[in-house]
Amino acid sequence: VHEPGLNYSSDGRCKVFDASADGMVGGEGAAVIMVKRANDAIRDGDHIYALLRGIGLNNDGAEKSGFYAPSVKGQSEVISQALQEAKVDPQTIAYLEAHGTGTNLGDPVEILALSDAYRLHTDKTQFCAIGSVKSNIGHLDSAAGLAGCIKVALTLGRGEIPPTINYCEPNSA
């Protein structure tokens, strides 16, 4: 149920990163990926959609305004951690799949955290496309992260970035 300023969209549309975004939309689904060492997958003749080069994990617990609210500091730290572990220069990343829920609070915090983390490595701007599968299928709760991983793997394999729907004007917050 929509309540202004809270989590759910007023019109049933998830408008990730859009000025008119006012909440997320729930979705239903499950996601499964097979994770295997690259050498083993090559040896076994498996089709490789993507490689996971590094991960980051943290908890920004007390540094945020509420249970569902993200923090810029916590997200920026975990993004930096993942980039460092993967040994990836952010300037080489052409597409980023964001959590992007379409909420007034979450999307601007996520963009600011990404900007802060990337600025540690480069002064370049607008070199990396960004999207969120949630505009297409809604928020799948515990399957949301894997849905995003699957989208990225398919994007890499096909060399085409699917559009983020319901996006017209950038959220200036």
What residues fall within each predicted segment?
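Condensing-enzyme catalytic core of the thiolase-fold
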Residues: 1-173
